[in-house]
Each structure stands twice: as structure tokens, then as C-alpha cells.
From Swiss-Prot:
One annotated GO molecular function: carbohydrate binding
Keyword line: Cleavage on pair of basic residues, Disulfide bond, Knottin, Lectin, Secreted, Signal, Toxin
Free-text domain note: The presence of a 'disulfide through disulfide knot' structurally defines this protein as a knottin.
Protein origin, superkingdom: Eukaryota
S-S bonds: 51-63, 56-68, 62-75
Family from the record: Belongs to the neurotoxin 10 (Hwtx-1) family. 51 (Hntx-8) subfamily. Hntx-8 sub-subfamily.
Removed propeptide positions: 22-49
Source organism of this protein record: Cyriopagopus schmidti (Chinese bird spider)
InterPro entries: Huwentoxin-1, Huwentoxin_CS1
GO cellular component, one term: extracellular region
Name the UniProt record assigns to this protein: U5-theraphotoxin-Hs1a 5
């Protein structure tokens, strides 16, 4: 029983290693990984993100889509729950 479990586990590990090696040859995984991380990072940048939480007053407005909070005096998202 122990021998068959050991052989099964060894076979699965060997299958995993062979599959991983064939995929890494096709994709050149170590070379493409850093470039794919930095490419995905640039997709998440939003232009108006810096406006949220900025200090404001009624003379100095916020970006479009944001309003100045009366209590906290910073830019917050405009919505139907805001007065």
C-alpha cells in the first residue's frame, strides 16, 4: 500500500514537472513575467484618482464627479446620498 501511494505521488510530481517544463519553454516564463507585471500595473491607473481625498473649500472646487464634503473639507464622490 505504501509503495503504490509513493509511486502514484512520484508519478504525479513527474507529470507536473514535465508539463511545467514544456510550458516554460513555450512562453519563456522567467523573461516575460516582469514585463507582464508592469504592463498590468499601468492598466489600473486612473486619471482622477488623485482628486479623491484632496483638501478643498467651496471656492476651490474638486474634479468632475466629486464634491467638497461639508464636514471633512475634502473631495468625496458625488452621489444621490450626498446633499
Amino acid at each position: 500500500m505504501k509503495t503504490s501511494m509513493f509511486l502514484t505521488l512520484t508519478g504525479l510530481v513527474l507529470l507536473f514537472v514535465v508539463c511545467y517544463a514544456s510550458e516554460s519553454e513555450e512562453k519563456e516564463f522567467p523573461k516575460e513575467l516582469p514585463s507582464s507585471i508592469f504592463a498590468a500595473d499601468s492598466d489600473f491607473k486612473v486619471e482622477e484618482r488623485g482628486c479623491l481625498g484632496d483638501k478643498c473649500d467651496y471656492n476651490n472646487g474638486c474634479c468632475s464627479g466629486y464634491v467638497c464634503s461639508r464636514t471633512w473639507k475634502w473631495c468625496v464622490l458625488a452621489g444621490p446620498w450626498r446633499r
